[in-house]
From Swiss-Prot:
GO biological process: DNA-templated transcription
Organism: Geobacillus thermodenitrificans (strain NG80-2)
Residues the record lists as binding Mg(2+): 449, 451, 453
Residues at which Zn(2+) 1 binds: 60, 62, 75, 78
Protein's recorded name: DNA-directed RNA polymerase subunit beta'
Catalytic activity: RNA(n) + a ribonucleoside 5'-triphosphate = RNA(n+1) + diphosphate
Domain of life where this protein originates: Bacteria
Originating gene: rpoC
């Protein structure tokens, strides 16, 4: 057996007739498949056992030899070799064609490879191949030219005139003869000469021809092999025929297609033997050609061959193409054993690293392990009896199962898996029932809820797989979100509400002002009803044994509440005591104002003070992030579990409910509405008098109603009782927000019509009062559009993720340091005056490229090549520095990936990135996963001259595909001054920019908004009008750096507008992949052809070689490719073919004789090799896991 992990590379090429015959185990001569009576394969037919091997293991066709002992014997009666039946999956046959046939991929593809080799147009080729015209193959001494086309009539005339002194023929044989006559070296040499002088269209054609001829020359493929003499027949198990219940047969379409080929081939042989008239033979040859075309790629030329019910038959090409094709269905998406799925329910009592597995499911999943253990313990004599015991569910089986699943993590996955947190490992605990129990805190990462979601379970089998699951994938390890490095396991809903309720303060609650000696005493008083959870009390600070208190503070009384005492119990002892939800308290220490000297009148102090707000969801997030920063994973996951338990416990105790009476309607609502109506009437009067335009009237009416709604919202929020359950829910961040509340109690406000334009009649009622029929009808537009949009968006966002993954899948951290001398100058990303991404956010987790000094004191804040942490970043900001040179993926020199220093911190762990991390995939997931949160609509911005500027998901696609944007801005191509802005006759602006050398004028449409004025200095690439810049134009006018910055800024802008934070480095990885190619302009003395796309590294290699040999190097310009284009241009043909345009990619690769070096992840998944990332890298290959018996406390955080 081939060891897949020993592969160096994979090569594809054209097969010669000899090669096809050498693969074959025999010739298929008959179109028959199987005998309908005996159901055995017919001899010499498409399923023949003599050619393809026996249908039953170790049994020949006639039954003379049965049993393993005859292994390898060839039966003397039927000629079948006695062997395993699975050879029918690998043995090929062949058909000897009676006439050569052209291969449709090479003749019909775009560009036609055959046409380029022969320098004939595809139309001319088609006429020859399908027997419509003759082609001159050898003009002899006649005035005819080689490759000249002759119609039937002309051919006859020339035959009469010149007799046999020239040769012309039709069909694929003629083409084959022409292909055989080609001298590649000579042809290439003449073309290179012509290229020196050629211009325009002719030059482009020569370059294209040169490319194809060079590929043939260097790959060792013979152009004549594009015409087939022998047709391979694929193994029968790959085109099976199965019997259905009713005695009928279902068969693969390929068998029909092969049958047609064999039938026509045999008929042609017979006609040739009979010496039939030329016209009949030609017709039969044409039909054979068409049959082979249909077999290879049905429907590529003319109407597809159809089966019953007018369904086009699936040919060999269709077997590879598309989502259901071989690549995506079977090679990239395999089904796996040892897996199961079930509905999920919440498991509130689980630990962070646990999940509940239903007993019956666990028994089935761990069956082999349980059987082994049963035999080892002597509870069963052999494997068979062990299996029987399990099937009959003996009581002792459960005890064994309990022991087997200890320490054996399982993987849980929820579809759609949008990012790496969609698959995590848990330690299973057995539960009754048939539902999987899931820890509530991991729901956010999975985006799971318990309304009927299902999840899949997978069992890692080998010791290595288990170790990886435990060390890398355990849910307790995945606390941070890879896209921004913020905790993803924040409590939600009930847990937030419980902790909010727990940390509330209330005036005049029972027991206010009591002083306790320690926590136990306070809790005793609380449990016995002497003091309320929300009462402000004092406690002896020293008794809390908090390590952040100073000695003076320890001698004082701490002003707090019972609830906060309980809350602080869950935090590590060396963490500040959190008494107020402020950053100073969480990141620094408890403020001094809460410490009272002993002997002070506590009640008086309390009366003087404001109430401290309770801890909301955001604050809990901050606490988790800070605990993680200081104490790392184990401590954080323990604390999260405790926070979850507290939350559930106290939201239960709080008994917070909702009733209609909680929705209080605002008394002054009518007043506000009447006021707004009066304003609207005034606007209408102005419009009727012609003082304002219709558009202005519309804008003003909308703004009046919006203002009215905002006013109602403000009043409502102010008038609400702080203990109103609905207010508590929305304020804590558990559920709902102010706008939901306004719609319940205030007014619903303005709605949009199906086209997205706002209807100027607002909905004045609230849900509490009830809507009128018209109001209800208006509101249905928005609701329906929302649902339709969501459905469309999911598909679009998924496709974007797929393209992103494809373009970046081979970006892996390959080395420690690439030694680059470049970096990028990081400033805050701004859009006009608005800051999109702050400077500190861009700096954290990066390496400095140059040493940063304090501008005043001159002391070193961070040295060159040192990691910038949160604290250093804050120092840089405090020092007033606005720009810093940092290492960036953009400037990384590593081939096929990035280096540790240029990438910086791994957002998912908060540590340095490891060599082997698949950062490309992480980047793709981080950008794709929030895609569903982005809006679909194109906004109408601005007043009358409002042009559509794409936003949301379509804008992200536009940027990554490097398309010409909608609402394109005009940019200046030179540095200079705007000397004039004129209006032309046809209502356009003409902007004239003048530099010292030249003057350029730009035309902008009349409704464009200008961004410059006369006399202003502009730089190359600066926008003259508002709108989106075309990145390709920017690259042409300026340089790579400005394009990188522009794309980074624009993508960030879209995501930040929706409140999604993504780390810069993910977008940088993508943009770098879009800019990795250059187009050769002048080849110099090198072998590259002008106009070809080369990888930047290949280009530098070629030039370095030329300079070493003293030749003139080539010149090239950088190109920006969209992500689809960039994925198809990758060096790996396996990766490109499994992405899109499969046939085109494979045709091209075969002619070039491409080698796939298997550097990316996708190629390795396809051939079944370990991926060269993470633990699959060569450097980790030889690490063997050692099993040591360990106690539970070694591996799992215990409580």
């Amino acid at each position: 057996m081939l060891d897949v992990n020993k592969f160096e590379y994979m090569k594809i090429g054209l097969a010669s007739p000899e090669k096809i015959r050498s693969w074959s185990y025999g010739e298929v001569k008959k179109p028959e498949t199987i005998n309908y009576r005996t159901l055995k394969p017919e001899k010499d037919g498409l399923f023949c056992e003599r050619i393809f091997g026996p249908t039953k293991d170790w049994e020949c066709h006639c039954g003379k030899y049965k049993r393993v002992r005859y292994k390898g014997v060839v039966c003397d009666r039927c000629g079948v070799e006695v062997t395993r039946s699975k050879v029918r999956r690998e043995r090929m046959g062949h058909i000897e064609l009676a006439a050569p046939v052209s291969h449709i991929w090479y003749f019909k593809g775009i560009p036609s490879r055959m046409g380029l080799v022969l320098d004939m147009s595809p139309r001319a080729l088609e006429e020859v191949i399908y027997f419509a015209s003759y082609v001159v193959t050898d003009p002899g001494d006649t005035p005819l030219e080689k490759k000249q086309l002759l119609s039937e009539k002309e051919y006859r005339a020339y035959r009469e005139k010149y007799g046999q002194s020239f040769q012309a023929s039709m069909g694929a044989e003629a083409i084959k003869k022409l292909l055989q006559d080609i001298d590649l070296d000579k042809e290439v040499a003449t073309l290179k000469e012509e290229l020196k002088t050629a211009q325009g269209q002719r030059r482009a054609r020569i370059i294209k021809r040169l490319e194809v001829l060079e590929s043939f020359r260097s790959s060792g493929n013979d152009p004549a092999w594009m015409v087939l003499d022998v047709l391979p027949v694929i193994p029968p198990e790959l085109r099976p025929m199965v019997q259905l219940d009713g005695g009928r047969f279902a068969t693969s379409d390929l068998n029909d297609l092969y049958r047609r080929v064999i039938n026509r081939n045999n008929r042609l042989k017979r006609l040739l033997d009979l010496g039939a008239p030329n016209i009949i033979v030609q017709n039969e040859k044409r039909m054979l050609q068409e049959a082979v075309d249909a077999l290879i790629d049905n429907g590529r030329r003319g109407r597809p061959v159809t089966g019953p019910g007018n369904r086009p038959l699936k040919s060999l090409s269709h077997m590879l193409k598309g989502k259901q094709g071989r690549f995506r269905q079977n090679l990239l998406g395999k089904r796996v054993d040892y897996s199961g799925r079930s509905v999920i329910v919440v498991g509130p009592n689980l630990k962070m690293y646990q999940c509940g597995l239903p007993k019956e499911m666990a028994l089935e999943l761990f069956k082999p392990f349980v059987m082994k253990e049963l035999v080892e313990r002597g509870l069963a004599h052999n494997i068979k009896s062990a299996k029987r015991k399990i099937e009959r569910v003996h009581p002792e089986v459960w005890d064994v199962l309990e022991d087997v699943i200890k320490e054996h993590p399982v993987l849980l996955n929820r579809a759609p898996t949008l990012h790496r947190l969609g698959i995590q490992a848990f330690e299973p605990t057995l539960v009754e029932g048939r539902a999987i129990r899931l820890h509530p805190l991991v729901c956010t990462a999975y985006n799971a809820d318990f309304d009927g979601d299902q999840m899949a379970v997978h069992v890692p089998l080998s010791a290595e797989a288990q170790a990886e699951a435990r060390l890398l994938m355990l849910a307790a390890q995945n606390i941070l979100n890879p896209k921004d490095g913020k905790p993803v396991v924040t409590p939600s809903q009930d847990m937030v509400l419980g902790n909010y309720y727990l940390t509330m303060e209330r005036e005049g609650a029972i027991g206010e002002g009591m002083v306790f000696k320690d926590t136990d005493e306070a809790l005793l008083a609380y449990h016995n009803g002497y003091v309320h959870l929300h009462s402000r009390i004092a406690i002896h600070a020293g008794s809390l044994k908090n390590e952040t208190f100073t000695p003076e503070q320890n001698n004082k009384l701490l002003l707090t509440t019972v609830g906060k005492l309980i809350f602080n119990e869950i935090l590590p002892k060396s963490f500040p005591y959190i008494n107020e939800p402020t950053t100073e308290n969480i990141e620094g220490r408890t403020p001094d104002k809460y410490f009272l000297d002993k002997g002070v009148d506590v009640r008086e102090e309390i009366r003087k003070r404001e109430l401290v707000p309770p801890f909301k969801k955001k604050v809990l997030g901050q606490i988790i992030a800070e605990v993680f920063k200081r104490f790392k994973i184990t401590e954080t996951s323990k604390m999260l579990d405790r926070m979850k338990d507290l939350g559930f416990q106290y939201s239960t105790k709080a008994g917070i409910t909702i009733g209609v009476s909680d929705i209080v309607v605002l008394p002054e609502k009518q007043e506000i509405l009447d006021e707004a109506q009066a304003k609207v009437d005034t606007v209408l009067k102005q419009f009727r008098r012609g003082l304002i335009t219709d558009e202005e009237r519309y804008e003003r009416v909308i703004s009046v109603w919006s203002a009215a709604k905002d006013k109602i919202q403000d009043r409502l929020m102010k008038s609400l009782d702080k203990r109103n359950p609905i207010f508590m829910m929305s304020d804590s961040g558990a559920r709902g927000n102010a706008s939901n509340f306004t719609q319940l109690a205030g007014m619903r406000g303005l709605m949009a019509n199906p086209a997205g334009r706002i209807i100027e009649l607002p909905i004045k009622s609230s849900f509490r009062e009830g809507l009128t029929v018209l109001e209800y009808f208006i509101s249905t537009h928005g609701a329906r559009k929302g649902l339709a949009d969501t459905a469309l968006k999911t598909a679009d966002s998924g496709y974007l993720t797929r393209r992103l993954v494809d373009v970046a899948q081979d970006v892996i951290v390959r080395e420690e340091d690439c030694g680059t001398d470049r970096g990028i100058l990081a400033r805050a990303l701004t859009d006009g005056t608005e800051v999109v991404v702050k400077l500190e956010e861009r700096l954290v987790g990066r390496y400095a490229h140059k040493t940063v000094h304090h501008p005043e004191t001159g002391e070193v804040i961070v040295r060159k090549d040192e990691m910038i942490t949160e604290d250093i970043a804050n120092e840089i900001i405090k020092a007033g520095i606005t720009e810093v040179w940092i290492r960036s993926v953009f400037a990384c020199n590593t081939r096929h990936g990035v280096c540790k220093k240029c990438y910086g911190r791994n957002m998912a762990t908060g540590m340095d990135v490891e060599v082997g991390e698949a950062v490309g995939i992480i980047a793709a997931q981080s950008i794709g996963e929030p895609g569903t949160q982005l809006t679909m609509r194109t906004f109408h911005t601005g007043g009358v001259a409002g042009d559509d500027i794409t936003q949301g998901l379509p804008r992200v696609q536009e940027l990554f595909e490097a398309r010409n944007p909608k609402g394109q801005a005009v940019i200046s191509e030179i540095d200079g001054t705007v000397v004039a802005i004129n209006e032309t006759r046809d209502n356009q602006y003409e902007i004239v920019v003048q530099s010292e050398v030249e003057t350029r004028s730009y035309v902008a449409p009349y409704n464009a908004r200008l961004k410059v004025e006369e006399g202003q200095h502009v730089e190359r690439g600066q926008e003259l009008t508002e709108g989106s810049v075309d990145p390709k134009q920017l690259l042409r006018v300026r340089d790579i750096t400005s394009v990188q910055e522009y794309l980074l800024r624009e993508v960030q802008k879209v995501y930040r507008m929706q409140g999604v934070e993504i780390s810069d480095k993910h977008i940088e990885v993508m943009v770098r992949q879009m800019l990795r190619k250059v187009r050769v302009i002048d080849a110099g003395d090198t072998d590259v052809l002008p106009g070809t796309l080369l990888d930047v590294h290949q280009f530098t290699d070629v030039n370095a070689q030329a300079i070493r040999e003293g030749k003139r190097p080539a010149t090239a310009r950088p190109v920006l490719l969209g992500i689809t284009k960039a994925s198809l241009e990758t060096d790996s043909f396996l990766s490109a073919a499994s992405f899109q345009e499969t046939t085109r990619v494979l045709t091209d690769a075969a002619i070039k004789g491409k080698r796939d070096e298997l550097l990316g992840l996708k190629e390795n998944v396809i051939i079944g090799k370990l991926v060269p990332a993470g633990t699959g890298m060569a450097r980790y290959r030889n690490v063997k896991p050692a099993v040591k018996k360990e106690t539970a406390s070694d591996t799992v955080p215990s409580n």
